[in-house]
Amino acid sequence: MTAQNALFTHDLTGKRVLVLVPHADDEVNAAGAILPAFAAMGADCYICYSTNGDFCFRAQTRIREAAAAAALLGTKSERVIFLGYGDTLNHTGHPHLYDADVPAAAPSGHTETYGAAGYMDYATQRRGHPSPYTRAAFRADVAAVVEEIRADIIICVDYDKHADHRMLSVIFDAVMGKLLTADAGYRPLVLKCLAYATAYEGVPDFYAPNIRATRRPIVGELTDYPSDMLSLSYYVWEERIRFPVFEYETTGGRFLRRDVRCRALKQHRSQGAALHAEGILNGDAVYFQHRTDNLAYTASLWASSGDPAPAADGRYYDIADIDEEDAPFGECLWAPADGDDARSIAFTFPTETELRLMRIYGNIGTYGRITALRISCDGVCIGTHALPPRGRALTLTLDAPRRVREVCLTVVHAEGTHWGIAECAFFSSLWQTGVLLPFIKIESGGDFLYDYWTPPAQTKLVLHAYRYGVAETAPLDWQMDDGGGAQSAHGRRGAVSWRRRDGDQGAGDA
């Protein structure tokens, strides 16, 4: 059985894609499945490495390997960027630059950015001098890259167990929050990913009869990552975005050594990265979207007490200790002062705005939360709700778009300590529209279908459609060919049962 969809027929000519990763080989973990597709669709692809990977190996070695892998993934050498910061593992005895107000010395001995293997570090290339190893300089360099490229699609690693990954993720979120607030005309598609939990430490199941989807990590079983991020904040597994794999859609075959991701991993010989290929090569690419069309970025904020800015700064949490793998999360919250009876925060939009969807995030910690939050639009209460635990979003979808000038949130009741609101998001539409058009992908049992094999004894296969930017209630038109003539149906929703006749392999698409 074979199945295709229209995702890879999109024309991205003139569009830009930026992949932000901390180390050479993370580009495969973060974007190896989708970056070749974007390049084939005409996009200009960029990869930015924040460190030189110089913890155990010379920067010259790591940079050469990165450039070779990037070329295989469709990124030209002039679009490969190295910020040039030091590679710092957890607990090296060196202060991490995330905590440094004065230049920190990396394990390699460097205290400022540098290049190698024919590549200059970004700061020297753009400003004529390197950047010191400080948090402020790192943030400035990340911001400069994002603002210079102004990519239509940005992929960045998210919070995981490695200090360098954590730093890039948190700094990137802060940079984007500031940029989106200052520039209402820039609204890229931003995708975050877990380079360890859903890639580098993925299930080694490449040789299953049919290619498997990325499996949700189970702490202690599928990954040694001690914090189950996939139950916290915006990491709701069921809300992940899944992209088909370009390699399987276009070649019609599955061969480990021929797969572009495996070939890219092999370039990272110093890391032995290809040893993880069987777990990295899955049938989908999994991301968590940070919607940038949040109306809160253009709103004026007011609070009865406390600083309202953290409720619309792009950050859902911070880091209490960059080195500790299981350290408590740092909070970046709006919280009213003790004795404030009003306990309210308001978002006033420049003009009356159409509102369809709201997502309100509380604190990610376990020590307290808001158990009753009154939500009002232009002075009219539309409901009182408890915020879910662990910073997960309270999601409210209006039955119909509503014209609104102001949204006010009032804490009616809270329990515990250190509770507050981490981020508020207001949207005019259910999905962010932009560079990628909606698509569907046929799946069965949660696995995307490509060149799908069924044993001769199997006579029935239940099919579903994964939808990107398409409502679950929207009807689907589908057509199937069982070898004896096409059969079609219209207006069907949900699962489709496919049976084949003896001796027929069958084929289907939708």
What label would you give each PLM region?
Residues 2-185:
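Active-site beta-strand->loop->alpha-helix modules in alpha/beta enzyme cores, enriched
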Residues 2-4, 11, 92-132, 140-144, ...:
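C-terminal accessory domains and tails appended to enzymatic cores
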Residues 293-324:
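Predominantly extracellular/luminal regions of secreted and cell-surface proteins
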Residues 326-383, 387-434:
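Aromatic, loop-rich ligand-recognition surfaces of beta-strand-rich domains
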Residues 400-403, 495-502:
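Surface-exposed, short loops/turns at beta-strand junctions within beta-sandwich domains
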Residues 436-473:
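Solvent-exposed, low-complexity, repeat-rich "mucin-like" stalks and linkers
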Residues 448-450, 471, 479-498:
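Low-complexity "stalk/linker" and mucin-like segments enriched in Ser/Thr/Pro/Ala/Gly
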Residues 501-510:
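Append "Rare intracellular matches occur via the same short Y/T/C beta-strand/loop motifs
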